[in-house]
Amino acid sequence: MKALIPKYAVLPLALAFAVNCAAYFGARLFLGNTSYHHMTLPIDSIIPFVPAFIVVYLLAYVQWAVGYIMICRDSRQVCYYVMGAEIIAKCICFLCFVFYPTTMVRAEITGSSLFETAVRYLYEIDAPNNLFPSIHCLESYFCMRGAFISKKLSGWYRMIMILAAILVFASTVLLKQHVVADMAGAIITAEFALWFARKTHIDQWFAKINFLERRPPQ
């Protein structure tokens, strides 16, 4: 039976996860008494607070798991290319978090419904920093772009990834976890990272260092 995660994908996934943790949690070590910037736009005040979207926000983790596994199973080249771009993007996120830290005013939760209680808990465990660019949006965008980079994934799967990405993007602003600028920053960061990874042939670099790669017999 074919492994869920190919052996050649283990190292790229591990590196991507490590860099993600370093960028997100490590950046907070540098903040301290930092002055924060606000990137709220007029449109952000128009967007309503919809607690029910906490379901979509949490289900994003399922999309990421499925999306990255499918990307890694596609081929070595696609796996190395997308995961390399993912690592580049997280390095950019780290720089933004440290050198241009942003924050926002979150929604005032007065109710006690299940959804409102869940959002209140989210607010308590996730401080309003490390916002620009939005990692939540970044991950969903990479899953969607990876579906189109792949030559093997079907049209219906791509449509599902598009819909999932749209819903996740919407959830970040409807829960007042992010502002519109954070979403735009995620797209720009991802596209730049994909471009840079392609220009630098990062897939070839991964092929050289990946000691776990299964090489076909000569």
Predicted features and spans:
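N-terminal transmembrane-helix/juxtamembrane module of multi-pass inner/ER membrane proteins
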Residues: M1-W64, V119, P217-Q218
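Membrane-interface loops
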Residues: L29-P42, C72-W156, Q204-Q218
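Hydrophobic, membrane-inserted alpha-helices
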Residues: Q63-G67, S140-R145, L163-S171
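Interfacial helix-loop-helix junctions of multi-pass membrane proteins
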Residues: A107, G111, P128-F132, L167-W195
